[in-house]
Amino acid sequence: NFRNETVDWKHLAEFNQSEGIVVSHDVNFRHLKGYLRQFFTRLGYDDVRLRPAYYPYTELSVEVDVYDDEQAEWVGLGGAGMFRPEVVKPLLGFEAPVLAWGLGPGRIIMRQHDISDMREMYRNDLELLRDTEAWVR
């Protein structure tokens, strides 16, 4: 996906996103918040912040930020929300609560591999590629 951002240590002109959904009559926004906090805590992020956000297909919506000690700032890792009913029925053919999230793996990979600048992951550095067993563990 293209993003109209100034390229810097945490932004590129393009981004990748991994998405997930949970469909169940027994889930609500509290469950989504719990899934997100547990997911990022298990990845090793101690400070996870959920901020209100706007996404056209979800309501309630949040942005997920984690605190980056090295950069001394909050860094966004994804967005999430509850699919709006007018999205769910045409998509699934029935009404049910749907938890949805989209997470960018780039900044997560940076932390796992001690990379301080996202642009490093896209250089044609054969030594880096040979020395890196896998980007995602």
Residue ranges and their predicted role:
Residues 1-137:
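TRNA-recognition modules of translation machinery and tRNA-sensing kinases, especially anticodon-binding
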